[in-house]
Amino acid sequence: MIKVLITGDTHIPTRARKIPKIMEEIIQSNKPYQAVFFTGDLISEKVLRYVKSLSEKVFIVEGNMDYLSFPEKVTTEINEINIGLIHGHQVFPRGNIEGLIRIAKEMNVQILINGHTHYAKIVEVTGEHGSKIVLANPGSLTGVWSGGFASMRPSLIIGYFKSREVFLELYELYGTKLETKGYVFTF
């Protein structure tokens, strides 16, 4: 089984000082990760060093607030499932499902990881000929504000890939209460 961390939009130190303790505990207690996907807006080199310490394989895209240089889009594959990573500022309005589907098709990916909205959301869309696209947005790891409809809740996703089955576990912090939701997809 392959385990990955999906996170982003920390905005440290401009909008948050640090990762909330409970989110840090989740990250540390679930190690090791075979890969980390970061949706951009990490802002500082300190956060970059931290993210790179979590796995030997780290994928990062440039957010609209990053001054550090990263690619705009990344594609990779796990168990023959094509995965794309973008920040999400490429679509308007923020989080627009049709725009994200268009990008997923352009990138030829079955899973599109995106951020920017600061609102965690996992949806499956059935396309032509029964094909499916999963849109996975981990929200903001620090739960900071954004220019749209941010949830203001720290959140992240841990993904498990076993053959052609993918289990995504979404963690969201509501004040001091941690909630988890699981999603299973077969490709």
Residue ranges with predicted function:
Residues 6-8, 35-41, 59-63, 84-87, ...:
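Active-site neighborhood of phospho(di)ester-bond hydrolases with catalytic His/Asp-centered motifs
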Residues 1-5, 75-84, 126-135, 161-168:
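Beta-strand-turn-beta hairpins that frame and shape the catalytic cleft
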Residues 102, 107, 136-187:
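Binuclear metal-dependent phosphoesterase catalytic core
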Residues 12-15, 42-46, 65-70, 91-95, ...:
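Active-site environment of divalent metal-dependent phosphoester hydrolases
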Residues 57-108:
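Helix-adjacent hinge/juxtasegments
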Residues 1-57, 66-72, 152-155, 183-187:
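N-terminal active-site segment of His-dependent metallophosphoesterases
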Residues 54-58, 123-142:
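Short acidic, glycine/proline-enriched helix-loop-strand junctions
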